[in-house]
Amino acid sequence: MEKYTNWRDNGTGIAPFLPNTIRKPSKVMTACLLGILGVKTIIMLPLIMLYLLTGQNNLLGLILKFTFSWKEEITVQGIKKRDVRKSKHYPQKGKLYICNCTSPLDAFSVVLLAQGPVTLLVPSNDIVYKVSIREFINFILAGGLDIKLYGHEVAELSQLGNTVNFMFAEGTSCNGKSVLPFSITGKKLKEFIDPSITTMNPAMAKTKKFELQTIQIKTNKTAITTLPISNMEYLSRFLNKGINVKCKINEPQVLSDNLEELRVALNGGDKYKLVSRKLDVESKRNFVKEYISDQRKKRK
């Protein structure tokens, strides 16, 4: 792995795009696991159909728990567990929440938190794209490099007043060892929240305060993916291990121009383990090309 030093942060030593070392199950084990999944899917088919018709998030939770042994642990910063109220402390309609991304399953994680229908957002070069759950999953499984192929542009937050809105601000996935630089600037994020600031007096616009909450998502390493991977291979990774997710809903942060406060919050409050801004989506694109090329050479 030393050859990938171009994609290792000089300050922290973290290589955010390197895949985790995961032992693949045997073909026999994979076949057995997929067979069990098929049986579970048939059993849950009525609930799956009902979820597709109603979009009720609690139904999705039941499906995931039975089918994939999904377990989740949710904490709200500053609130004792016994005092947490979903109607007050969980993500609400009309609001925007900033999330990190390590896995296509992050889409399910935020849906289970949401107190209403969900919109998923992924920025790229200051343009915000809206994607469905399926589009988000396909995007991450394809390597998380070209969101414009999966979603469509959305101009402002006011268009999403009837949904709970989650933005995966890094614009791609990483291995969870740090938080990548965002694919949207502070200026553009503020304009997305309130386009009227573009017509304000510059001095007045500068004094306008914006606050957002972040949601830090952690999952077991078998579910984390930074590289293109097939649906079948991805399923086989975690079917025998189950899925364990931890979500932390952080306190609101006042937005700065560089949005570093949001990255720090998503990184568990550790600003010293943030990778540099050069390790962005374009850097990942180059890493993926070289890594896949090297893997092909090894197989020859």
UniProtKB/Swiss-Prot annotation:
Organism source for this protein? Saccharomyces cerevisiae (strain ATCC 204508 / S288c) (Baker's yeast)
Query: For this UniProt entry, what is the primary localization, expressed as one broad class?
Result: other
Family, per the entry? Answer: Belongs to the 1-acyl-sn-glycerol-3-phosphate acyltransferase family.
What reaction does this catalyse? a 1-acyl-sn-glycero-3-phosphate + an acyl-CoA = a 1,2-diacyl-sn-glycero-3-phosphate + CoA; 1-hexadecanoyl-sn-glycero-3-phosphate + (9Z)-octadecenoyl-CoA = 1-hexadecanoyl-2-(9Z-octadecenoyl)-sn-glycero-3-phosphate + CoA
Q: What EC number(s) does the entry state?
A: 2.3.1.51
Q: What does the UniProt function comment say about this protein?
A: Acyl-CoA-dependent lysophosphatidic acid acyltransferase with preference for oleoyl-CoA. Involved in triacylglyceride homeostasis and lipid droplet formation. Involved in vacuolar protein sorting.
Q: Name one GO molecular function term.
A: 1-acylglycerol-3-phosphate O-acyltransferase activity
Transmembrane residue ranges: 33-53
Q: What is this protein called?
A: Lysophosphatidic acid:oleoyl-CoA acyltransferase 1
Q: Which domain of life is it from?
A: Eukaryota
Q: Which GO terms describe its biological process?
A: intracellular triglyceride homeostasis; lipid droplet organization; lipid metabolic process; protein targeting to vacuole
Identify its membrane topology class: Single-pass membrane protein
GO CC, alphabetical: cytoplasm; endoplasmic reticulum; endoplasmic reticulum membrane; lipid droplet
Q: What else is known?
A: Present with 6630 molecules/cell in log phase SD medium.
Compartments it resides in? Lipid droplet; Endoplasmic reticulum membrane
Location of the motif HXXXXD motif: 101-106
Keywords, ordered alphabetically: Endoplasmic reticulum, Lipid droplet, Lipid metabolism, Membrane, Phospholipid metabolism, Transferase, Transmembrane, Transmembrane helix
